[in-house]
């Protein structure tokens, strides 16, 4: 049994039909006995749509406070995709859970909109994987 990490981009996550196809692919690997970690992007065009809304509200805003909110906004696209994929995996009969970055937790530096990961505490992920969940 191997630990396998799949990354799916916005096009692969672009509709419920495509999310269902990703879930079927991931479920196939999980049923073969592999531990699966899936990292989905936001649905195609969603990040641009969300950031476009922010620019309509404050087109030339600068500073850490604004950058922080842009990061919070952009993350919602990935959070939605993660939850939708977990739901699709559950529909395929798989135990699955999604996380927001703070739930893992993933720690970054404070370079808003260009942050770098400093650490990942993978204890929760490993625990859920050991219990047979797709994460």
Where are these regions (language model features)?
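Nucleotide/pyrophosphate-binding catalytic subdomain
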Residues: 1-135
């Amino acid at each position: 049994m191997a630990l396998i990490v799949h990354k799916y981009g916005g096009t692969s996550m672009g509709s419920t039909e495509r999310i269902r196809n990703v879930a079927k692919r991931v479920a196939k690997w999980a049923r073969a006995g592999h531990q699966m970690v899936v990292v989905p992007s936001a649905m195609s065009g969603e990040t641009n749509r969300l950031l476009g809304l922010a620019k309509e509200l404050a087109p030339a805003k600068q500073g850490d406070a604004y950058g922080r909110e842009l990061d919070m906004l952009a993350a919602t696209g990935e959070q939605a995709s993660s939850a939708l994929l977990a739901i699709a995996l559950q529909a395929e009969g798989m135990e699955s859970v999604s996380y927001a970055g703070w739930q893992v937790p993933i720690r970054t530096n404070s370079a808003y909109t260009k942050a770098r990961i400093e650490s990942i505490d993978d204890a929760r992920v490993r625990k859920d994987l050991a219990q047979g969940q797709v994460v």
